[in-house]
Amino acid sequence: MPQDPRAPAGDFWTRVRALPTLGLGVSTEYGAAAAPGALDPRALRLAHGCADFLEVGVELSRGLDPAALAWAAEGWPTTYHFLDVNLDDPADLDDGWLSGLRALTAQLRPAWLCGDAGLWHFGRRDRGHMLLLPPILIPEAIAPMAAGLRALRAATGLEVLPENPPGAAFVGPMHLLDFFGQLAEAADTGLLIDCAHLWMFQRARGLHPLEALDRLPLDRVIELHIAGGRPTEHEGLGLIEDDHGIEVLPETWQIAEHIAARSPNLKAVIIECERNSIEAALPLYAECRARLGAHLPRAEAP
């Protein structure tokens, strides 16, 4: 796999200083803005000042939708969230996929790449698969995933931030935060912590919302996700549906406040609310600003 000549040089502590501070943003994925009643990211930014940047969820076989293309045409800040690569599988970083990735990043000009570090597909990659299972939480699973992160960074010239995936059940004895902390160090990279996903893990294991955060290298946390979740039950099993609604659970806020206050390199926070109306989403932005206060990263002037 050829290395991009723009590949970030130096160790993480050198590279992180070159990353821009993006502020408070919104996420989207293909077709989300076209859903009935869904917010328009451009309007959220222009009319309400609530979208410093756009995190674009991308499955290469689908490409960019009109909302993402319109944002990119303005030259506004973005990040690229992959939805179709298993980082621990070298075959996923094939020449065709990397070529498509480079073409889309040339359009979006993202500050970095990010995405859930889990199983996006089982077997051959196929359009619309988007399985998304969490990784098996064992030490042996770390090295292959770290190798994928390093390879993707070298091939694209962009930082790659692994995100903790959602799940109703988690296999393996390790705590999720121990796994991701060790992964970040092995890959010499930063982290994207999804606070709603983390609460799903803690709840599934019967743990306190802040369990093991004292063991996570918080100086590697670059981005946070905050999203609504809906508690539900299936045949006696308590679950949280990761619905990206407007009802953010108290434990999710607790996690976000704790991490934001202790992460000196935090550069971006996303409110995941893409399929809700602007009117429904605005209170979430106000609450996020109030709760994170001085710890909320402020976007750099263009």
Residue spans for each PLM region:
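Acidic (Asp/Glu)-rich catalytic clusters
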Residues: 16, 43-49, 63-80, 96-111, ...
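Active-site-proximal loop/turn and secondary-structure-junction residues that shape catalytic pockets
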Residues: 30-32, 58-62, 84-86, 117-121, ...
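Conserved, mostly hydrophobic/aromatic
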Residues: 54, 113, 194, 224, ...
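Acidic/histidine-rich catalytic cores of soluble enzymes
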Residues: 153-236
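C-terminal helical cap(s) of enzyme catalytic domains, especially alpha/beta-barrels
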Residues: 278-301
